[in-house]
């Protein structure tokens, strides 16, 4: 039993490496690791990662040795990042709380700002902003949702650091 679990854990890590690590919840799971767990342990569909598109679905099917037909998408989306219209920002801090990678800085009742290099384009801040002062804009440096491994690793690292920090605050 432990050998089977060990193999499943290794497979889960490989799936996690294939996911873009946006932590965007578009797959309906709270984060990429939860989705990877669902694929391994609950036989979840492989096509639920919208940002990863067919590219990620194909990688995961190869990891699982599943011979599924993946509909290739030639469409390359602009890689968006969030932008705050600072004059309209009320400093509510909601965006700071929902950002999975701590890419937003600011204080209560003060203007907030996006750290462009850290923003992974998850759009969680956009949907939560109560005054609609945020928008997604193209990031010229990153022109596709198909993140290379280095960017995904940075996003995963920032997310894990936020989890550790927020867990310490709650204690």
Regions found by a protein language model. Give the residues of each.
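General detector of N-terminal leader/presequence modules that precede the first folded domain
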Residues: 2-23
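Flanking helices and flexible, charged tails adjoining ferredoxin-like Fe-S electron-transfer domains
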Residues: 5-11, 72-73, 116-171
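Iron-sulfur (Fe-S) cluster-binding segments and ferredoxin-like electron-carrier domains
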Residues: 11-18, 29-64, 135-139
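Aromatic-flanked redox-active Cys/Sec active sites in thiol-based oxidoreductases
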Residues: 21, 86, 101, 116, ...
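Iron-sulfur cluster-binding cysteine motifs and their immediate structural context
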Residues: 26-38, 94-113, 124-141
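Short cysteine/histidine-rich metal-coordination sites, predominantly Zn2+-binding motifs
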Residues: 40-46, 50, 108, 114-117, ...
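Long amphipathic N-terminal alpha/beta scaffold segment
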Residues: 49-94
């Amino acid at each position: 039993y432990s050998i089977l679990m060990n193999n499943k854990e290794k497979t889960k890590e490989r799936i996690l490496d294939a996911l873009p690590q946006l932590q965007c919840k578009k797959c309906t799971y709270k984060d990429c690791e939860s989705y990877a767990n669902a694929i391994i342990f609950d036989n979840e569909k492989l096509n639920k990662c919208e940002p990863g598109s067919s590219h990620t679905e194909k990688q995961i099917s190869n990891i699982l040795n599943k011979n599924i037909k993946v509909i290739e998408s030639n469409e390359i989306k602009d890689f968006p990042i969030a932008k705050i219209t600072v004059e309209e920002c009320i400093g509510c801090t909601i965006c700071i709380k929902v950002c999975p990678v701590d890419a937003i800085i600011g204080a209560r009742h003060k203007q907030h700002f996006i750290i462009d290099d850290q923003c992974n384009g998850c759009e969680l801040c956009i949907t939560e902003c109560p005054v609609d002062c945020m928008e997604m804009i193209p990031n010229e440096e990153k022109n596709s949702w198909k993140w290379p491994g280095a960017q995904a690793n940075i996003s995963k690292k920032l997310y894990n650091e936020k989890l550790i920090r927020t867990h310490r605050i709650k204690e």
